[in-house]
Amino acid sequence: MSHEAPTYAEVDPFDLPEWLGECRVTWDAERGLSTGHRVTGALAADGHDPLPCDLLAVDDAYPEPVAADAIRVRAHQVWRHGEVMIAEDHGRMLLVVPGSRVDTETALEAIARLARAVGAPSGSYAVLLEVRF
């Protein structure tokens, strides 16, 4: 089985499906936040197919860097200006965030920044996390 290198191609929010800015949307983590630097999940709304959407903590560097320096710098730059870097990797949407792990606060903030980027009304997005112990 060959391993393809990640692409992390940046995506313009205006190129995303319109329903992301029009419906009540829930982001659901598939396995919780303690899964490392990439948390897989999906955005869902009634009447629409789920859209795969992962959270990627871009600063993890062991045993090898998660992303090239240019991607890391861009993610930090966008975050510093109150936005989230939206990217694509092999057909999955990514919200690229600073840090080496995704915690609850970062997950909530990343989804809120996505909602603003697509013009969603305040309060129309929710985050569903499992409690694992």
Label the predicted regions.
Residues 91-112, 123-133:
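Well-ordered alpha/beta subsegment
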Residues 73-77, 110-121:
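Conserved short hydrophobic interaction patches
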Residues 3-6, 80-81, 119-133:
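Short, charged, intrinsically disordered terminal tails
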